[in-house]
């Protein structure tokens, strides 16, 4: 099979027709296989009042029972809890991190309710940045906890957005992809819901709040996303209760007057949210988090560290240059430490040699003293042996003289 060559090339690039199969047409398959083997990461932040249905909606979205501990209304300050799960669907692995607010909106003074949320998002950006700045970094092994999407839960009042909602979404707009959802939308009528949606969009636009819009520049999904953008904010219902209707198991919320089917688009926008969030635009959320929100944070932090854009050099070039300087400084420090270590080793060797010489001198002195003492003892021994020999000779002479005297006496 002959590979096709793209024709949209600059004029100075030659177009060649392959005479046979080469094999680089398998590159997309290689990328897909590599991505599947590594798995994917997706992090969701749910911001909303206590008991508004955050946990239930997440469990409905992923058709999975999560171990969420219930929150209470007694917290003095809002807190966040994050739980990570490893999910698998058709050999595709997903490391899902779910972050929920606890005690959000329960305080009398709600002025700083959103601060812990903003701090959490910034902390995840900072963790990723510090990993990037390491001399020996391993981004593939690093667990990326940057928030890819924030589902902002709006209470179904049917009137308008609360001031806390406007302030919160305004502070989050440049840090995370914000998707507003109307929680427990089955508690208001259809006509009220449509008016409520229109009022929410009007207030968001009048306050110039930037919420996430599904991208329409990709021809493959532009039509679908354009239609779905008109349904924002999504009116959702979550439920873990399942019943059989016409022989089919469906998730519902049952009331004395009837039931609401979670996955019925005539009843709520849950299916639309799931389609847009997980099945169509998950990768765009991930890319936008990295390419827009994280880059904004990264640029600001690098400027704080002393990296600045100028006419001659871009921020990225400045960053790379400063990183290269840091690498050289580190190498220089390593060389200085090595030289210092070598010098200390030499000094220690010199001390050991001096001590060895002193020991050798003492050994030679003791050896000489020992030889002299030995010589003296040998001389004393020789002198004593000579005295003993002389004594033996005198003794023999005396004995001979005594024998001679005895012989003469007998003869007389």
From Swiss-Prot:
UniProt: Mg(2+) binding residues: 55, 100
Subcellular location: Cytoplasm, Cytoskeleton
Alphabetical list of SUPFAM superfamilies matching this protein: P-loop containing nucleoside triphosphate hydrolases
Region (G4 motif): 183-186
Annotated positions binding GDP: 51-56, 100, 184-187, 192, 238, 253-255
Gene Ontology cellular-component terms listed: septin complex; vesicle
Region feature G3 motif, mapped onto this chain: 100-103
Keyword flag Glycoprotein: yes
Entry note about domains: C-terminus (307-412) is necessary for binding to liposomal membranes as assessed by phosphatidylinositol-4,5-bisphosphate (PIP2)-containing giant unilamellar vesicles (GUVs), models of biological membranes.
Protein name as it appears in the record: Septin-10
Source species of the chain: Schistosoma mansoni (Blood fluke)
Taxonomic lineage from the root: Eukaryota, Metazoa, Spiralia, Lophotrochozoa, Platyhelminthes
């Amino acid at each position: 099979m002959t590979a096709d060559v793209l024709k949209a090339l600059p004029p100075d690039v030659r177009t060649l027709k392959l005479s046979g199969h080469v094999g680089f047409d398998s590159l997309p398959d290689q990328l897909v296989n590599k991505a599947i083997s590594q798995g994917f990461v997706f992090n969701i932040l749910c911001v909303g009042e206590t008991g508004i249905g955050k946990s239930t909606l997440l469990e409905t979205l992923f058709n999975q029972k999560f171990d969420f501990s219930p929150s209470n209304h007694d917290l003095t300050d809002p807190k966040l809890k994050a739980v990570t799960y490893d999910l698998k669907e058709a050999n595709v692995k997903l490391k899902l991190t779910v972050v929920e607010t606890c005690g959000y909106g329960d305080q009398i003074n709600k002025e700083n309710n959103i601060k812990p949320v903003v701090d959490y998002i910034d902390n995840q950006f900072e963790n990723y940045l510090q990993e990037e700045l390491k001399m020996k970094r391993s981004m593939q092994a690093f667990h990326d906890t940057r928030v890819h999407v924030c589902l902002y839960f709006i209470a179904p009042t049917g009137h308008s957005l609360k001031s806390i909602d406007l302030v919160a979404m305004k502070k989050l707009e440049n840090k995370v992809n914000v998707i507003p959802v109307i929680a427990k939308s089955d508690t208001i009528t259809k006509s009220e819901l449509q008016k409520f949606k229109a009022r929410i969009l009007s207030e968001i636009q009048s306050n110039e709040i930037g919420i996430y819009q599904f991208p329409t520049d990709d021809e493959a999904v532009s039509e679908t996303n354009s239609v779905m953008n008109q349904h924002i904010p999504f009116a959702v219902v979550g439920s873990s209760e399942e019943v059989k209707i016409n022989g089919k198991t469906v998730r519902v919320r049952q009331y004395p007057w009837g039931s609401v089917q979670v996955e019925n688009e005539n009843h709520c926008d849950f299916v639309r949210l799931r389609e847009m969030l997980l099945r169509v635009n998950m990768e765009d959320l991930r890319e936008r988090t990295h390419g827009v929100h994280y880059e904004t944070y990264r640029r600001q932090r690098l400027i704080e560290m002393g990296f600045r854009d100028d006419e001659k050099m871009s921020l990225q070039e400045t960053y790379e240059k400063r990183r290269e300087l840091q690498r050289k400084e580190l190498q220089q420090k390593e060389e200085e430490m090595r030289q210092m270590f070598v010098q200390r080793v030499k000094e220690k060797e010199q001390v050991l040699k001096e001590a060895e010489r002193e020991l050798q001198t003492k050994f030679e002195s003791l050896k000489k003293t020992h030889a002299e003492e030995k010589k003296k003892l040998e001389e004393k021994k020789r002198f004593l042996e000579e005295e003993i020999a002389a004594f033996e000779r005198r003794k023999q002479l005396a004995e001979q003289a005594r024998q001679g005297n005895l012989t003469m006496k007998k003869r007389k």
